[in-house]
Amino acid sequence: MYYLKPIGVVEQNENYTVLNIFDEFVEGLDGLKEGDYIIVLVWFHKNDSEEKRKILKVHPRGDINNPLKGVFATRSPYRPNPIGKYTVKIHKIYRNKIFIDKIDAYNETPIIDIKIFSEKLDCPKI
């Protein structure tokens, strides 16, 4: 059995998103700064049900005019493990809050990890 421990939650505001990091993990933010790009992994908790985890084919972007594809070939939130990934720029860090551009995660979406973006590691040469 695997166990994921959320490190914070998403807070949605009108024009931006805040990543609220739980106090016990704030020390892990040391070294991040304004202007850095980070990868944020979240748990799509509103799509987490046994039925939704069994969905393996979807119409991309929810458009029935798009042919069905396997979920691993899409960005669908319906997945066996409903993990979402965002690459975002840090606009400000204040205490336990990271201010970023607006993302489409729901308010209170659990944050399961943050990683610094590395062009060398995250942008394959094609």
Curated annotation (Swiss-Prot):
The keyword Membrane does not apply. The keyword Oxidoreductase does not apply. Keywords: S-adenosyl-L-methionine. It comes from the Archaea. Signal peptide: none annotated. Residues 4-126 form the TsaA-like domain. Coiled coil: none annotated. S-adenosyl-L-methionine binds at residues 45-46, 75, 106-109. Belongs to the tRNA methyltransferase O family. This is Probable S-adenosyl-L-methionine-binding protein MJ1583. It comes from Methanocaldococcus jannaschii (strain ATCC 43067 / DSM 2661 / JAL-1 / JCM 10045 / NBRC 100440).
